[in-house]
């Protein structure tokens, strides 16, 4: 890896892109010259050497959906499988090549038409070669003594399995075995730093992905009702994504009613909703491979009960406290502290905790900071600051500690506070004197709120012009949600009870 003191000069990528896109009309598409600027910004980080970036491989079985490796997609915009990019830098000059499989009529009858190597330069801006020539090219470059920098394909383990024996990792092992003197360094961190700052074209794609996603949330709010299956709402959401131009769900759609709303990554979507419960929907589409991430919580019967309203409003107020502190070149720490203070005050007011700094002896698997596990951690299971969005639903962001630790222009990210009162919460605590004293105080209140889960997740883009709320299309204030849910919607196909009039 390049020395930590070697950074892309501030604004280099933005400057390259600005020059490349001068006089280009604004549109929801990334120009080939922007991809060229990204590659130039990456190779600017090395004096000389060979950069090798691996695309994703075609799934062995046909039912998994192919996902391009995000780092590779960022550098090339090429969405087909089994491709490899090389960039060779010598004496300041860079030669790039995109290696792709040879087209065969039989394979194309099964998998569809692929881009020929001869057509790659027109399509991607990078000259192409058949992948059969990749090994010979690499052996020749290794013999030259140039250092190698690898942009790995390990990110694919997020999509399929935890197996890290990817094509890229095997390549590194084999190359090192054949050339033990060769200098080899990862370049993934450099790519993440570039990806963290979104260009205007990327923000436009994320804006459109979020608009489609919020439209789907509106449809879900109008359809949800007692007796409706979570799976029916899932189908409605994902159908709406496609109907309005989305590629696919950006991640597994979470449609959790009742106790399922307290499971953060619940994806079975198999339960029938009941009157008096909350419904938590965490679902969004990708658009041109850029994924949004939106969550809304609503009452199944269209009317928040007093208890539901109280829990929901704490989450909403915490989100607002966090958002008010978002500014360029500011750490997220102060925003987190502000949101946490709102949550602590709200939980104390409801009687779910004894004090803002009160602790418990944690259940198995709970991670705690120094000083012990706060009681509020039983209900606030994750941070408020969310994550970046982009080519991955959890994308790099400049305010991440390992990148810049400060918000910057071009950050696109979520703010997603949540509170969850699991029905199993009390039983999960170890039997200790401290916990017995805690339970004696809060048990009746915990039982009152048991089975309620609330999360509100919104997408924001931070630019020099200010903070843009991209997900404003999905209602999040209690009166707005209830008003939308009073609207009638035709029954879903299949005879489900979703959308029937409320009494």
Name every feature range the model reports, one short phrase each.
Residues 1-13:
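Bacterial N-terminal signal peptides that target proteins for export
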Residues 11-23:
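Bacterial N-terminal signal peptides
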């Amino acid at each position: 890896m390049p020395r930590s003191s070697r950074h892309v000069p501030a604004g280099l990528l933005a400057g390259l892109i600005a020059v490349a896109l001068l006089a280009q009309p604004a549109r929801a598409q990334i120009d080939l010259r922007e991809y060229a600027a990204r590659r130039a910004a990456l190779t600017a980080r090395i004096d000389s050497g060979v950069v090798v970036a691996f695309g994703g491989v075609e799934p062995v079985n046909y039912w998994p959906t192919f996902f391009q490796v995000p780092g590779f997609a960022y550098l090339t915009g090429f969405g087909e499988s089994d491709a490899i990019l090389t960039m060779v830098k010598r004496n300041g000059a860079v030669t790039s090549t995109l290696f792709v499989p040879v087209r065969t009529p039989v394979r194309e009858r099964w998998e569809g038409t692929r881009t020929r190597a001869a057509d790659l330069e027109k399509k991607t801006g990078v000259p192409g070669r058949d992948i059969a020539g990749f090994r010979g090219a690499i052996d020749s470059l290794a013999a030259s003594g140039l250092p190698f920098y690898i942009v790995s394909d390990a990110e694919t383990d997020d999509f399929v399995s935890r197996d890290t024996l990817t094509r890229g990792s095997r390549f590194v092992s084999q190359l090192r075995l054949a050339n033990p003197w060769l200098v080899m360094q990862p370049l993934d961190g450099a790519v993440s730093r570039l990806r963290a700052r979104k260009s205007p074209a990327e923000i436009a794609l994320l804006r459109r992905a979020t608009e489609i996603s919020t439209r789907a949330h509106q449809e879900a709010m109008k359809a949800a009702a007692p007796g409706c299956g979570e799976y029916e709402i899932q189908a409605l959401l994902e159908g709406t994504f496609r109907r309005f131009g989305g590629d696919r769900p950006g991640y597994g759609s979470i449609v959790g009613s009742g106790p399922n709303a307290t499971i953060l990554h619940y994806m079975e979507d198999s339960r029938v909703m009941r009157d008096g419960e909350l419904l938590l929907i965490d679902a969004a589409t990708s658009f041109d491979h850029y994924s949004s991430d939106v969550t809304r919580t609503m009452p199944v019967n269209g009317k928040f009960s007093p208890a539901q309203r109280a829990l929901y409003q704490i989450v909403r107020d915490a989100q607002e406290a966090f958002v008010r502190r978002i500014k360029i070149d500011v750490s997220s720490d102060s925003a987190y502290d502000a949101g946490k203070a709102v949550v602590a005050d709200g939980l104390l007011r409801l009687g779910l905790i004894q004090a803002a700094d009160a602790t418990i002896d944690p259940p198995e698997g709970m991670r705690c900071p120094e000083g012990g596990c706060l009681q509020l951690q039983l209900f606030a299971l994750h941070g408020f600051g969310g994550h970046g969005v982009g080519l991955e639903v959890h994308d790099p962001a400049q305010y991440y500690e390992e990148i810049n630790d400060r918000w910057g222009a071009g950050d696109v990210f979520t703010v997603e506070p949540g509170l969850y009162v699991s029905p199993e919460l009390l039983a999960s605590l170890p039997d200790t004197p401290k916990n017995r004293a805690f339970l004696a105080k809060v048990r009746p209140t915990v039982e009152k709120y048991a089975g309620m889960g609330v999360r509100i997740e919104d997408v924001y883009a931070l630019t020099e012009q200010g903070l843009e709320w991209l997900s404003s299309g999905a209602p999040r204030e209690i009166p707005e949600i209830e008003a939308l849910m009073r609207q009638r919607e035709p029954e879903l196909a299949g005879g489900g009870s979703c959308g029937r009039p409320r009494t």
